[in-house]
Amino acid sequence: RTFRVGRVDDVLADGARKTIQLEGKSILLSRRGEQVIAFDLTCTHAGCPLAYNAKGGRITCACHGGAFDLDGKPVAGPPTIPLTRLECAIDNGDLLVHISGTQS
């Protein structure tokens, strides 16, 4: 399912990161110019919710001490699978995020 999040310039400034909620999921958005990257903030180890730590530059899991870098790659703890990256597009200035029912 694809969600129209809003005007990309209103949702996220260039170079910024932001956590949003869609369909009960926490999503981390990251913008570099006209490219927006989105990750599902659910740990790939045990399904626990993740937190984005702006100061530390990591995405962390309180359940088992797992951590991911800002590219979604596991860097600490038990996770071995990268975060699920969600499809994003900018359509006439609107940010679109697609959430599927399975991890990819």
Predicted ranges, named:
Residues 1-56, 82-104:
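N-terminal pre-ligand scaffold of iron-sulfur
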